[in-house]
Amino acid sequence: GLMNTLKGAATNAAVTLLDKIQCKLTGTC
């Protein structure tokens, strides 16, 4: 349903954001 789609999109965005933050903090990209 729509909520599942939104949840998936939000999760993907959060994971991408965390990856970028971790990349900057630890220098492991």
Curated annotation (Swiss-Prot):
Family affiliation: Belongs to the frog skin active peptide (FSAP) family. Brevinin subfamily.
Organism of this sequence: Pelophylax ridibundus
Origin organism lineage: Eukaryota, Metazoa, Chordata, Craniata, Vertebrata
Expression (tissue specificity): Expressed by the skin glands.
Location of this chain's protein in the cell: Secreted
UniProt function note: Antimicrobial peptide.
Disulfide bond annotation, renumbered to this chain: 23-29
Protein name, as recorded: Brevinin-2Re
Domain of life according to the entry: Eukaryota
